[in-house]
Amino acid sequence: MSRPSLTRFLIEEQHAGRIDAELRQLITIVSRACKRISIAVSKGALGGVLGDAGTGNVQGEAQKKLDVLSNDILLEANAWGGHLAACASEEMDHSQPVPDQYPSGDFLLLFDPLDGSSNIDVNVSVGTIFSVLRAPKGTEKPGDEHFLQPGTQQVAAGYCIYGPSTMLVLTLGHGTHAFTLEREEGSFLLTQANMRVPEDTAEYAINMSNQRHWEPAMQAYVGDLLAGKDGARGKDFNMRWIASMVADVHRILTRGGIFIYPWDKKDPSKPGKLRLMYEANPMSMLVEQAGGAATTGRERILDIQPTQLHQRVPVFLGSKNEVAEATRYHLDADKA
């Protein structure tokens, strides 16, 4: 029996009344853009796309050539279809409405065009993360303020991981599903429906080099993980860290674990590393739809009311019971 394609999956979701034609078109166009990015990434040095672009983004980070190329691909692909009102990117200072010469649609698209791009030159898996919101009714030219909706308002979220195979992981609010790119025919085919994150885990992903900058609750939590079966947790834990959020979260969606990027005082102007709108919200929706959980260590990420387009937050996401345990350490410390 042949595997359903992404196109068929989306049409069936539309027939079931779970999405409308505009959202189906939007996801289809994003998936096509991801195919183009996948081709560019796979060429590596042969495509002349490695290295720095010589520019910086609004985050103050040096842009890679592939950051800029991926951003341009997503902008161009989504400009003219009539399904989008505006888009916002980690690589742009402000949101960008659809050009005047094209029809405007009902949706807002946010994306990190190439998450983990610092790993490109060493051939580690990277990916595109995206989030879809509805434009507020009556909004003719959406601005930054119209994107400031809590993650619970997302109508779709996903990522495309460019690794040994290219995979699109998607939620439309009814489970999380994985599609693998069949390169010969150029189609994303459903390879894992209704992904489930195990409730318990003995695996965590964190950058331990920042340990000295963590708050006491975080120090205590990781200290107990490191103590293993001889400590308070009574079991051994393994640590994994790829330094590419897409790759780390994909592993957790596949076999469980907890991904942690906590609050730290390394840079007081950036106490949280990850962006709420482009990374934390879409990944939290995907993980929750797969039975996992996602918090800042103190509150559910999807409940946060954003105040800035490029807002940063701490992130704890993955296996539900372990996220709850990590959150408990922080809440108990706050009460002490």
Swiss-Prot record:
Q: Where in the cell is it found?
A: Cytoplasm
Name the pathway.
Carbohydrate biosynthesis; gluconeogenesis
What's the cofactor?
Answer: Mg(2+)
Subunit-structure text: Homotetramer.
EC top class named in words: hydrolase
Name listed for the protein in its UniProt record: Fructose-1,6-bisphosphatase class 1
Where substrate binds, per the record, is at D115, G116, S117, S118, N207, K273
Describe the reaction catalysed, as an equation.
Answer: beta-D-fructose 1,6-bisphosphate + H2O = beta-D-fructose 6-phosphate + phosphate
One matching Pfam family, short form?
FBPase_C
Which residues, by range, are in coiled-coil regions?
A: none
Q: Which GO terms describe its molecular function?
A: fructose 1,6-bisphosphate 1-phosphatase activity; magnesium ion binding
**Assigned keywords, A-Z:** Carbohydrate metabolism, Cytoplasm, Hydrolase, Magnesium, Metal-binding
Which HAMAP family does this entry report, sorted A to Z?
FBPase_class1
Q: State if Cytoplasm is listed as a keyword.
A: yes
Its family remark reads:
Belongs to the FBPase class 1 family.
NCBIfam families, sorted: PRK09293.1-3, PRK09293.1-4
